[in-house]
Amino acid sequence: MKKTFLLALISFLWCFHQSCQAQTGTQLVAANQNGFYYHGRINFANPKAPEFYWPGTSVDFIFRGSKLLKILLEDEKGKNYFNVILNNQYAKPYLLKCQKGKKKYAVYNNLDAGKSYSVSIFKRTETDEGYTKFMGIELDNGADLAMVKRAYSPRIEFFGNSITVGMGNEDPTGRDNMNPAKKNNYLSYAAITARDLGLDYRCTAKSGIGVMVSWYDLIMPEMYDRVHPDKPALKHDFKSWIPDIVVVNLFQNDSWLVNMTRDPNHKKRFKQGKPTAQQIVKAYMNFISNLRKVYPKAKIVCTLGSMNAVSPGKPWKGYIQQAVNLMKKYYKDQQLYTLFFAYNNRKIGHPTVTDHIKMADQLKKFLKQNILK
């Protein structure tokens, strides 16, 4: 009898110990589970490890019942940076610097398990820094993701270059622009505009790119329809996410390279010599026409700035305005707009966060007055 009782007691204590361990342990919440909400052009070939490429790509979720949050990522080069925003505290993000390969990042450790927390994991950097695979999160056992029915938000997509990416915007000196740590799409004019206006945001931008010529062998008309900029066979499904508003900010790189006759990219793109004004306008019209084909109902805002392509005496604003005027006249496209950002008069480097805030203010005002009214 005593022996039986003793065995039963030992068995009970062992089960209790295992139960406590289970309750105090952790669990993996895989990236393909319900409760994760993704934003951006993402490669879901492996649903348990979706690949993030573009700046501004993000995943949002709400969890409850956990004191900790760990994020599982696999980074290609160890050069990407993410903002982790807890409970919409936009001004105080957790800065996550990726290490190369598969890593687990302990982001929060002392949360109140009795509360719910909203989280956004936002890619600050771009495809130049390589891909990042999101492999899920780790929470305390017993925690779960909240299923949230989200109201529809108007959608906005930006097509642009390093200005839209946010290259060097956290480098006030202008001399360390190439440092990925100084690149923050979260504080680009594009992301600020979308966030402040409550728009669902997507950013299809790459530093150095142009409409006719780039600083490398790829131009926007060749890249705009790809899931990954360097993989032409991997095409984006434009029907999977349709924006209400499209903002195009291109021609800054063209404005330099059309005059650099010795540059190899210039030589390849302009075999017959420097392009004429008519050819430049036609190239812009062709690209906007490509966007119109895939987004027939979108309001398209053609912008430029705030670097020296919009400085006094430069013809590039005129090229864009002429292209839009011609498309309105001959294609009867009345859903085209133009907006030119004020020249920031910066002699070195890219627009800073201060410049981006001014650009965002200008764009927000324009959208409110002309499209979101």
What are these regions (language model features)?
Residues 9, 19-159, 164-182:
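N-terminal secretory targeting modules
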Residues 155-159, 164, 201-205, 244-249, ...:
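Structural recognition of the beta-strand scaffold that forms the well-ordered cores
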Residues 284, 288, 321-324:
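Generic structural signal for well-ordered alpha-helices
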Residues 298-306, 312-373:
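Extracellular serine-dependent O-acyl
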